[in-house]
Amino acid sequence: YTLKCNKLVPLFYKTCPAGKNLCYKMFMVSNKTVPVKRGCIDVCPKNSALVKYVCCNTDRCN
């Protein structure tokens, strides 16, 4: 089973490579309404003072 994650424009998605079993969205903390990055990832990154990550593990959940 391979996960499908949305690209930055959610009309498009990609099939994740093996081992990358999470979808993620990355936001700037200053603007939490517009994601700056979306895609596949293996481990959810830690949030920082500037950047917030939202990760999930179902198809196109990002």
Curated annotation (Swiss-Prot):
GO molecular function: toxin activity
Expression sites by tissue: Expressed by the venom gland.
Cysteines paired by S-S bonds: 5-23, 16-40, 44-55, 56-61
Any Pfam family: Toxin_cobra-type
Annotated GO biological process: killing of cells of another organism
Family: Belongs to the three-finger toxin family. Short-chain subfamily. Type IA cytotoxin sub-subfamily.
This protein's name: Cytotoxin 6
Source organism (scientific name): Naja sputatrix
